[in-house]
């Protein structure tokens, strides 16, 4: 029996040798059909959802980038606005400081002027008061000196100077002599 098997094998036409890397045609056909079905399902169901998720992520990332850029631009604008306000405040402070300094100098000048005027007024009032006191003292002294000179003249002359005209003339002569001596001494 073994011989018949060999004989049958020898009588069969020879086929090409079997390559283990290339599968038979029926395997290829039956493998392509499920692959096509899986590919169709993948293309119609999975791939659109995957594309949708990718689009959402891309939009979210781009939106985040745009929001970040907008926030950055807003922050830059706020910084510029802050710097501008700070510069304006510094300018205003410098102007206020200069105005205050100018007003202070005006106040000092006004106060000096007022003090000088008040000082001059006080000195003038003092001079007037001194002049009035001097005139009063001179009048009192003239009166006393007149009386003393009359008393002295009466003692020297030994006569009474009752006559007002004589008395007045004697006093005037005596005081005129004193004034001449006082002005000559200066």
UniProtKB/Swiss-Prot annotation:
Gene3D superfamilies cross-referenced by the UniProt entry: F1F0 ATP synthase subunit B, membrane domain
As for subcellular location, the record says: Cell membrane
Entry coiled-coil feature ranges: none
Nucleotide-binding found in the keyword field: no
Molecular function terms in GO for this entry?
A: proton-transporting ATP synthase activity, rotational mechanism; proton-transporting ATPase activity, rotational mechanism
Q: Which residues cross the membrane?
A: 28-48
InterPro entries registered for this protein in UniProt: ATP_synth_B-like_membr_sf, ATP_synth_b/b'su_bac/chlpt, ATP_synth_F0_bsu_bac, ATP_synthase_B_chain
> Which is one Gene Ontology cellular component term of this protein?
plasma membrane
Q: Please give, as recorded in its UniProt entry, the membrane topology of this protein.
A: Single-pass membrane protein
Chief location: membrane
List UniProt keywords, sorted A-Z. ATP synthesis, Cell membrane, CF(0), Hydrogen ion transport, Ion transport, Membrane, Transmembrane, Transmembrane helix, Transport
Membership in a protein family: Belongs to the ATPase B chain family.
- Tell me the subunit arrangement: F-type ATPases have 2 components, F(1) - the catalytic core - and F(0) - the membrane proton channel. F(1) has five subunits: alpha(3), beta(3), gamma(1), delta(1), epsilon(1). F(0) has three main subunits: a(1), b(2) and c(10-14). The alpha and beta chains form an alternating ring which encloses part of the gamma chain. F(1) is attached to F(0) by a central stalk formed by the gamma and epsilon chains, while a peripheral stalk is formed by the delta and b chains.
What the protein does comes down to: F(1)F(0) ATP synthase produces ATP from ADP in the presence of a proton or sodium gradient. F-type ATPases consist of two structural domains, F(1) containing the extramembraneous catalytic core and F(0) containing the membrane proton channel, linked together by a central stalk and a peripheral stalk. During catalysis, ATP synthesis in the catalytic domain of F(1) is coupled via a rotary mechanism of the central stalk subunits to proton translocation.
Listed HAMAP family: ATP_synth_b_bprime (MF_01398)
Protein name per the record? ATP synthase subunit b
Q: Which organism is it from?
A: Corynebacterium urealyticum (strain ATCC 43042 / DSM 7109)
Lineage of origin: Bacteria, Bacillati, Actinomycetota, Actinomycetes, Mycobacteriales
The gene behind this protein is atpF
